[in-house]
């Protein structure tokens, strides 16, 4: 069984949030949000509130949009993107966060790119990631490359591997609802040596959905057992808002869902109708 964590996406980060985490048995949080949220987060206040209720600041999801401002794969945007992300990494590192989740590109029309254009996108991402890896190292942590949906880079295990080749200090975050097509277990096993954190959510194989496990098509016993087989030592971190797919959830619902998966129980209906 893994300790349970939640992303802050779709949530107000305040003392009430951390108090509810403690009451439910949520071990940690990933700091995430919109671009303007990142610019305005008071990390000192967040750290103080988290410490008060014994909640660990596990990871920091760097902003990935607006796409006309942030894109590590686009020549005209990559330098400023690295600058923005670099400052956020330094700030997060100052408060003990050591895993920085990154999207290696914005939305791109892959089917409209020539081979040379795609290659340049990959090379630009690699250069950007190498720069961020150095900043993260100085901050005491690692940049974690996330697998992404088909309109982005990277979408395949070999593409993630290619990006990781930019710097040996790069690590991986596997998102279980970004394989279109694909199987989360293939990514877990194919990237096991670099895997340090996950984003847990379900989907329908049509688009990313960020649903509660049990609402989609993911085989959660395969995912759980796959993580154990590769000796994954991180957390079971949900990237799901409190309002998702017609349901409203509380921290206790996520804990119940996780425990049902860990104990190989039939997944039920969690939360209340929206």
What are these regions (language model features)?
Residues 1-3, 12-22, 97-98, 130, ...:
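Histidine-acidic metal/acid-base catalytic patches
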Residues 66-72, 108-115, 206-211, 244-248:
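A short acidic, helix-capping loop that chelates divalent metal ions and anchors anionic groups
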Residues 1-94, 193, 256-274:
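N-terminal pre-domain/capping segments
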Residues 27-28, 56, 98, 142, ...:
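Residue-level detector of anion-binding/catalytic polar loops
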Residues 7-11, 32-36, 62-65, 105-107, ...:
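Active-site beta-loop-alpha junctions enriched in small/polar residues
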């Amino acid at each position: 069984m893994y300790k349970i964590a939640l992303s802050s996406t779709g949530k107000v980060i305040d003392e009430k949030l951390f108090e509810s985490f403690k009451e439910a048995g949520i071990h940690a949080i990933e700091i995430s949000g919109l671009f303007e949220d990142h610019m305005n987060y008071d990390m000192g206040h967040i750290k103080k509130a988290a410490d008060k209720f014994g909640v660990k600041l596990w990871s920091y999801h760097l902003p990935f949009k607006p796409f006309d401002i942030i894109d590590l794969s686009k020549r005209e945007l990559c330098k400023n993107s690295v600058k923005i992300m670099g400052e956020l990494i330094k700030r997060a590192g100052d408060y003990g966060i050591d895993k920085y989740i990154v999207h290696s590109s914005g939305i791109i029309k892959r089917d409209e790119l020539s081979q040379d254009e795609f290659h340049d996108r990959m090379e630009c991402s690699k250069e950007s990631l190498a720069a961020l890896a150095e900043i993260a190292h100085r901050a005491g942590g690692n940049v974690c490359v996330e697998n992404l949906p088909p309109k982005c880079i990277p979408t395949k295990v070999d593409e993630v591997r290619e990006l990781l080749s930019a710097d040996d200090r790069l690590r991986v975050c596997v998102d279980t609802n970004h394989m279109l097509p694909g199987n989360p277990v293939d990514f877990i096993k194919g990237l096991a040596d670099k895997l340090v954190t996950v984003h847990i959510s379900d989907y329908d194989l049509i688009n990313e959905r960020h649903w509660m496990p049990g609402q989609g098509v993911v085989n959660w016993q395969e995912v759980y057992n796959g993580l154990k087989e590769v000796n994954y030592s991180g957390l079971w971190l949900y990237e799901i808002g409190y309002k998702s797919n017609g349901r409203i959830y509380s921290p206790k619902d996520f804990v119940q869902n996780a425990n049902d998966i860990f104990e190989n129980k039939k997944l039920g209906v969690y939360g209340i109708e929206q």
